[in-house]
Amino acid sequence: KPEICFSFYNEKIFIDLINEIKNLQFEGYSLFIDEKGIIIIGCDEAGLYYGVVSLMQIVKGSLLNEKKNLIKKCKIIDYPDLKYRYYHESPGWGRKKEEKEKVVKWYKEYIKNFVAGQKFNMLCFNIDNQFTFSNPDLNTKAFITKDQYLEIAEFCKDHFIEFIPSLETGGHFNWVPKNKFPQFFEDGFTRQANVSHPHFYKFIFPVMQELIPEGCKYFNICHDEWWASPSADVTDKLNGIPRKEIFLKYVLDQYKWLREKGIRPMMYGDMLLKNHNGDDPGARKGLYEITKLLPNDIIIINWSSGVDPDSNKFFHNLGFEVICASNGFRPCVSDRNIVSGFGMLCYGFSFLMSGIVNDDFTLNYGYTSLLRTADYAWNIKNDTGFPVQEFERNKGKNVCAIGSVKPNPHRSSAFQIISLRKYVNSNLKDITGAELKISSAKNQFGFIPMEILKPKENEEKSLIVLNSEEKPIDIEINEPFSSIYFLHGCYIPKEKREEFFKQSSNFIWGVPIATYTFVYEDNTWERTEARFGLNILDISPPNLRSRYMSDIRYFWEGENDKEQPAFLYQYEWVNPNPNKKIKKIILQKTDTEAIAIIFAITARNVRWEEK
């Protein structure tokens, strides 16, 4: 734990800093760095935590500059503008076929780096058929146990994040197997719950109870998109009862059930708005009229601001706290003084990262949208609401680099270029039809010395291509290193691109297109993967914005000889066993349509502790 050491500083410095922050809002902090040391003072425990988060961002930024690993003097006084900084995850992991055993480990890393690490303070976890319920008939796709779920919830608590259970119990009821529970589905709809069934409450409330961890403060009851895609004969009444009364009764009954447990409900606002989903002809007619009858201590998650620009004001004027959270980044500049929170609905796409499901749509949910949302939620009062694209142009490259820095306590300042001369097997023109306009020689890439070979000086071979026609490539090393840097990219034939994107339905954390296996002198090994959208991408991506990825230390940008933009991506693997000699690196393709291409490899030496 941090300690105050007055031998380093004059007591007046502490008193001045404390006086400067004592009137700050909750979660504020002061960070002071000079040649003597570092002081972090938090308004509360969360503020102290965010001060450390900012310090680590500064440290990581300094570590990227190999020529000048210095932390500059600074004084920061900072606090969030909003009470709620909301990150909503609807993990579609139950549909994934691979790597399920790594989900909890990866998700905890994700929370630390991308949720808490970007100073979100709410994580709404919209889990349904991925959860292992006590009722076995619900578990057709389950793979997260209750213990694992509670482990994630506790991890959030440790990182000052409110963990919010969320369950779709109305309009998106298709997580429940219809063949097992047909009585709880309303006729005329594919996914609508029949909440007026006499036994529905006996079914749904025990299910909700299983998702509530100890100390839970909020529960998102959702209620978006009720009665969607009705058959032609559906009216605004069900069994003679107005549907708006059915909807109101159900929300109020859930509200009462949660409040008796000391839990505050949250819900989406689209069904409560005349100009969004609350007044369509047929089943939804007049639904919005119930809004004024709801308790205004329900927190409204408003994803409707793009459809109804006045929706934040509408809810605010009725006394509701409003969290403006949309599909991707959608600023609410005119409402900055009335919303209580801001956030993003991610649906598992941002976990997959950049451009992984297709080349355009999922960028709305990708890495830079996540970063921009976090920045806006913290600084909304003075933020002009500039778009994600502007954020990418001005800050994307540096922010992505900072996020990629990994702990490496044995890092040395010395490097060794691993010569690929004996291993190269092709050139870029033979693979893609175009060659890069890049100086082939030893150069600095993100302050790391790397060597790209000249094809003409090496029998027209300058890189390692991993495709279905090639055997694994074994690169001899026989030295200990603290980390290894890869300068790589990939190529996906145009006619195979659509098929490649289908792989995203199998994997949780990017699609692995190649494996890099490190074999030690004792024949034990470690492995990392080149994961599309995470640390590797097309050399010439169809959507250039995809290049901003979460696990690339640096990207080279230029063009090929066809005047097309081109990029190479630098990825660092940190060796967990720096005391062992790495005998060899095995490079191997995975079973996808993508072709991984390695241009250069550099190793960082080990800094041995003095004895």
Indicate residue ranges for each PLM-predicted region:
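N-terminal/edge-of-domain interface segments
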Residues: 392-611
